[in-house]
A protein has these predicted regions:
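Conserved PLP-enzyme active-site core in the AAT-like
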Residues: 10, 145-310, 372, 385, ...
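Non-catalytic terminal extensions of PLP-dependent enzymes
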Residues: 1-25, 37-77, 86-102, 108-111, ...
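TRNA-binding/sensing appendages of the translation machinery
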Residues: 28-42, 260-265, 691-694
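Flexible, glycine/proline-enriched loop segments at strand-loop-helix junctions
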Residues: 107-115, 136-139, 168-175, 215, ...
Length: 941
């Protein structure tokens, strides 16, 4: 053991004496003996991973800085959905760089998530204020995927008559960002949706359309009045989605006011860096009548057991973890951390600050337009917010711009497009004008006053924005800092205690991995900048793709998918494209085990596949006979199998190769869900097992944080025969020669996050990666063995061992004690712990995944809490008013009148060590039903 290595900092148990004690509890003599009992010998790798030895933290810090310095972010006026902006230092320091914010999990356990729930409610409120809509979700992945989600939402909202009539056409205005159009192409094809791409102002509805998509302002910057178009669409029973720039809505009439049914877009320019494409918070807002068809998470307002206001995730019955293939979307992880930052940006700036930012961009555009007109240039758009589309010789302008360290966008050889932003200065405007003047051999004219606004009078905003108290109360940095801290203290994160959520892999997000995200060379790159300006990024991306391919045993990798669910979808679409290339597009049946996570069937449904469920046996394994029967039955139409390995039940199934062979023999491909890859790395891999494609959750196995509900990255790795079909992009060269259309707005997805996983691999090296996997398995088996006398492990492998997680059986608690696993989860909050995964994949169980990062002392505390809670359950049997069912207990309740049969100390300090760092839940048990029945998804005074 040497604490000079990253591995010994990352892995929680490095002390040999502690490790021996754990192995003794398990009943094995060595780690190797345990691994041999856990992983079938037939799939064990025969040689170590072909990766370099791990760097030290110091070496990596120097290395990653050098890579960042090889990026050369020029002053970007490219626009196209990505803009330089002022990221408030107070938000960057207190949120983006703060582990209390970035290490928390999605707020399913709302009582210990009130801080980030309020931050997300602020985001929703800001979106509603700007768009003029009635209900908003708390983020999507990016603008392109948000638009695609809106398309499918409009498709789902078709009336019965429209469905009977076979309305499958979607009008798309051609003045749309190309990456957004590409996403629409990707998502529409599996549903048989026909895109009609045309000009909105000359289009006549035929009655075959179910919806329409327009951009506001348009891709070329034009501000257009869509009111008559919307009226015509509605007259033909078609709904309209507006893809709207949020900053522009500080000055422009809200889409909700001119009739749009859905409003989507990106919130990037409200306080989050470009980051070479992400992560950013996509958004969606709509009419309340459509709330049950809306994708993504919605934060609502409810009450707790004591009648206090409490926040929660509302209307969860729409989502994939419950509705599976009938869900509104496959989206799971979104962009919660970025949405929180946007919310704080709006809190900090308020209405005045937002208008000032918008006016800065608009004034710069107006001043430049006037100056260019004086030089004889022709603008294709006369009414604009921040973007000018200019007739000019692109090659000449580009050469002069690069000399000055400036990037524009060049839609064609005869046009130049430039977008201004909130950080544009008068000197920069003068520089741009001088550049265009030089191109014509002229001298620029200096104006003494600002040009008048070009916004049409009918489209100028008259309604107020950000009127809620929260957007007026925290305008100084001291006030904002304290507000952020108040919210922070209401949440449990990895900064407080272990989060043992099964199937979520809440491991350490090391500071050495997070620091590079704040480097200017990574933050300030535009995703559509020439790649020669992004040498550091391109080297990092190429190396990371190689490393992930090596780790998975596959041939190639795409980093474009920006969530695990997006990776699932991308992998299935690649398989689909492969079958189509062989003239077998009719292969559309996908086999999915009954135990699969809900995203699997939801993603398959979005990929246009017919789902056939495979049974599981009494031990939780795939019923191989049932799988073979169904593979043979559907052999002529079999697309493939989606399988999680180790299984969702936490065990390595010994017949996995037999399963893979059966699918291949029937003509199908094998998609492996990488959710549990933390139990494979360095010991086995999907390629060695026989899978054709797998997705990875970099925010699980590879040390990216969860961010309270995202962002994440979900790359796919594929075998050689699938390499040609990796996702492409309409602006940057990426993907295979026959690549599917884009699955994310940016060519390399959420590229700003990639240094995390890159560093994780570089600092652990092949040996460290293997050790991390081994210790994840050791920790899970230690806890399973140590708890065996009190909690039975529901499933185990043939040798009685589990993989990297285990399912604790609480199925008798309701009968024996009148207490269910939800009550146990709430009681754990009083002990300062986030509960494990509840009732998945088996009802009334807890799925525990300790990961390799937890120290033995922390695991022991968690187990002591579980055992003590069981004693409390035994003592409370038959009593309605008991310490477990009333949990969690707030400080206010403890300090108030007390009539319970148990003491205040028993409620708040049931074990001695809790007093050392007591976490106080901010609210008591929340009434979920009330929040759904009385949906409020914005701040209330």
């Amino acid at each position: 053991m040497s604490f000079d290595t990253f591995a010994d900092r990352h892995i929680g148990v490095s002390n040999p004496d502690e490790l021996k004690a754990m192995l003794d509890t398990i009943g094995v003599g060595s780690v190797d003996e345990l691994i041999a009992q856990v992983i079938p010998q037939s799939i064990r790798l025969k040689k170590p991973l072909d990766l370099p030895a791990g760097m030290s933290e110091y070496e990596f810090a120097a290395h990653i800085r050098a890579l960042a310095d090889r990026n050369h972010p020029l002053r970007s006026f490219i626009g196209m959905g990505y803009y330089p902006c002022a990221v408030p230092a107070a938000v960057a320091r207190n949120v983006f760089e703060n582990p209390a914010w970035y290490t928390s999990y999605t707020p399913y356990q709302a009582e210990i998530s009130q801080g980030r729930l309020e931050a997300l409610l602020n985001f929703q409120t800001a979106v509603l204020s700007l768009t003029g809509m009635e209900i908003a979700n708390c983020s999507l992945l990016d603008e392109g995927t948000a638009t695609a989600e809106a398309m499918l939402m409009m498709f789902a909202l078709r009336s019965r008559d429209a469905v009977k009539e076979g309305r499958t056409q979607l009008f798309v205005d051609r003045n749309l960002f190309p990456q957004t159009l590409d996403l629409l192409l990707t998502r529409s094809e599996p549903f048989g949706i026909e895109l009609i791409v045309d000009d909105y102002d000359c289009y006549e509805f035929s009655g075959k359309e179910f919806g329409a998509v327009v951009q506001y302002p348009a891709a070329d910057g034009a501000v257009r009045d869509y009111a008559a178009f919307v009226e015509a669409a509605h007259a033909h029973d078609a709904k309209v989605t507006a893809v709207a720039d949020l900053l522009s809505l500080a000055l422009l009439k809200a889409p909700g006011e001119w009739g749009a049914d859905i409003c989507v877009g990106s919130a990037q320019r409200l306080g989050t860096p470009m980051g070479f494409g992400g992560p950013h918070a996509g958004y969606m807002a709509t009419r309340e009548a459509y709330k049950r068809q809306m994708p993504g998470r919605i934060i609502g307002v409810s009450v707790d057991r004591l009648g206090n206001r409490a926040l929660l995730m509302a209307l969860q019955m729409r989502e994939q973890h419950i509705k599976r293939e009938r869900a509104t979307s496959n989206i799971c992880t979104a962009s919660a951390l970025m949405a929180s930052m946007v919310g704080f940006y709006c809190v900090y700036n308020g209405a005045e600050g937002l208008r000032r930012a918008a006016e800065t961009a608009h004034t710069a555009a107006c001043d430049t337009a006037r100056a260019l007109a004086a030089l004889g240039y022709k603008l294709t758009n006369q009414h604009f917010f921040d973007t000018l589309d200019i007739e000019a010789e692109a090659a000449v302008i580009q050469s002069l711009a690069l000399e000055r360290g400036i990037n524009f966008f060049y839609p064609s050889e005869e046009r130049v497009r430039l977008s201004f932003d909130e950080v544009t200065t008068p000197d920069e405007v003068a520089e741009v004008v001088a550049l265009f003047a030089e191109a014509r051999g002229r001298k620029p004219k200096v104006a003494r006053s600002h040009a008048p606004s070009t916004l049409p009078e009918a489209l100028r905003r008259t309604s107020p924005i950000l009127i809620e108290e929260v957007f007026r109360s925290h305008r100084s940095e001291s006030a904002l800092m304290r507000y952020i801290k108040r919210l922070e203290y209401r949440d449990i994160s990895l900064a407080d205690s272990m989060i043992s959520l099964g199937s979520c892999t809440m491991k350490l997000n090391a500071a050495a991995l997070m620091q590079p995200l704040s480097l200017a060379g990574f933050q300030n790159m535009h995703p559509f900048a020439p790649v020669e300006q992004a040498e550091g990024y391109m080297e990092l991306i190429a190396a990371l793709e190689r490393d992930l391919a090596t780790i998975t045993g596959l041939a190639a990798c795409s980093l474009q998918p920006n969530s695990g669910a997006a990776g699932e979808y991308a992998g299935l679409m690649v398989i689909r494209a492969y079958h189509q290339s062989k003239g077998q597009g009719y292969r559309n049946v996908i086999l999915i085990p009954a135990s699969a996570h809900g995203t699997n069937p939801a993603s398959a449904a979005m990929a246009g596949m017919k789902i056939v469920t495979v049974a599981c046996d009494a031990k939780g394994n795939i019923d191989v006979d049932d799988l073979k029967t169904k593979a043979e039955e559907h052999a002529s139409e079999l697309c493939g199998l989606m399988v999680t390995y180790p299984s969702t039940h936490g065990v390595f199934e010994s017949r996995i190769r037999e399963i893979v062979d059966a699918v291949h023999d029937a003509g199908g491909q094998v998609y492996m869900d990488g959710a549990n890859m933390n139990a494979q790395v360095g010991l086995t891999n999907p390629g060695y097992i026989g899978a054709d494609v797998c997705h990875l959750n970099l925010h699980k196995t590879f040390a990216m944080p969860h961010g309270g509900g995202g962002p994440g990255v979900g790359p796919i790795c594929v075998a050689a025969h699938l390499r040609p079909f990796l996702p492409s992009h309409p602006i940057a060269a990426t993907g295979g020669d026959e690549g599917i259309t884009a699955v994310a707005s940016a060519p390399w997805g959420s590229a700003l996050l990639l240094p995390i996983t890159y560093g994780y691999i570089k600092m652990l090296g092949g040996d460290g990666l293997r050790r991390a996997t081994e210790m994840a398995i050791v920790n899970a088996n230690y806890m399973s063995s140590a708890l065996a006398a009190e909690y039975r492990t529901y499933y185990s492998g043939e040798t009685g061992r589990v993989g990297h997680e285990m399912i604790l059986d609480l199925t008798n608690f309701k009968h024996d004690y009148g207490i269910d696993c939800g009550d146990i989860a709430h009681r754990l909050m009083d002990y300062g712990f986030h509960a494990p995964t509840l009732s998945f994949p088996v009802h009334e169980t807890l799925m525990v995944e300790p990961t390799e990062s937890e120290p033995k002392a922390e695991m022991d505390r968690f187990m002591e809490a579980l055992v003590h809670i069981k004693r409390e359950c035994e003592a409370a049997a038959g009593q309605e008013d008991n310490v477990v069912r009333n949990a969690p207990h707030t400080a206010v309740e403890i300090a108030g009148e007390w009539s319970h049969p148990y003491s205040r100390r028993e409620a708040a300090f049931p074990l001695g060590w809790i007093a050392e760092a007591k976490f106080w839940p901010y609210v008591s048990k929340i009434d979920n039903g009330y929040g759904d029945r009385n949906l409020v998804c914005r701040c209330t005074e």
